[in-house]
Amino acid sequence: MTVPCIPRGLVMADIAAFRLTEEEKQRLLDPAVGGVILFRRNFQNIAQLKELTAEIKALRTPELIIAVDHEGGRVQRFIEGFTRLPAMSTLGEIWDKDGASAAETAAGQVGRVLATELSACGIDLSFTPVLDLDWGNCPVIGNRSFHRNPEAVARLALALQKGLEKGGMKSCGKHFPGHGFVEGDSHLVLPEDGRSLSELEAADLAPFRIMSREGMAAVMPAHVVYPQVDTKPAGFSEIWLKQILRRDIGFKGVIFSDDLTMEGACGAGGIKERARISFEAGCDIVLVCNRPDLVDELREDFRIPDNPALAQRWQYMANTLGSAAAQAVMQTTDFQAAQAFVAGLASPQDTAGGVKVGEAF
């Protein structure tokens, strides 16, 4: 059967279970779609996951980009057969106890193991690292953050990025310009951060600025309002995305929206309005999760905006190692030692607060 040539579109969608239904195949063949995000509900075991990703990639050319939230700690979508990854706060604790060098070495190993294991299963991208500072205010961020110190966050994230690259993956820093100061969970509410731009510049923005300079491939903005800067949430704000992120910081990579079905996004109107505002604000790609009916609504008669850079930006997020090469790496004693080291960093406390961060079973 001839594989249709369909340029990747501007929507990243999801699927319901372990295999594609015929309805999902037709949805993923739509030109509006460019990628698929997987969740815990899509994972039964490694063999099944490999079959699923192969099935998705066989649908069209260029292949759909496959992503997952697989950060470590309480946000690790795939467990059985994968190395249990520590919460990123564990790396911050190493920074405080044993120094920067030891923590950066550990972060590099975590990134390498994380990416290689996913690459072996046909995954292109994990939405990581979290660049939010741990101000002690935000339970949904909490131990997902490396540290409260911007320098520590930036250096540990950069070390993790280098590890990801060894495993064939690019980085995606989130949640721009910082979700750690607010108390609310943007999956459930629309939080507000009342600080000034100068206060944000002095702290939360620093890791994004440094990582942009060091080759961070993608950014995901927060569904948070910063009223002293703009009355719109960052992901819907031209001030944040076009002026501050693109112009002032100089970020050249991909901007993914956070999930447009989250409560923090719903105030912008229906799904077509949310997508339109996201694109006008500067997002390249929008995530629409857990609501296939809304993906279908976007497909029906929504005018997808022209984005000349889209094809190049999508391709930049594709895995660079490949499944077969990653599987070969996993057989080496060096990599197996790295797996053992990383597993030794994880602990039951890493999952404190529950695993269902942005998850739907």
From Swiss-Prot:
InterPro entries for this protein: Beta_hexosaminidase_bac, Glyco_hydro_3_AS, Glyco_hydro_3_N, Glyco_hydro_3_N_sf, Glycoside_hydrolase_SF, NagZ_Beta-hexosaminidase
Binding-site list for substrate: 69, 77, 144, 174-175
EC number: 3.2.1.52
Lineage, broadest ranks: Bacteria, Pseudomonadati, Pseudomonadota, Betaproteobacteria, Neisseriales
Entry keyword annotation includes Cell membrane: no
Sites marked Important for catalytic activity: 185
Family designation: Belongs to the glycosyl hydrolase 3 family. NagZ subfamily.
The keyword Nucleotide-binding appears for this protein: no
Name the UniProt record assigns to this protein: Beta-hexosaminidase
Pfam families per the UniProt record, alphabetical: Glyco_hydro_3 (PF00933)
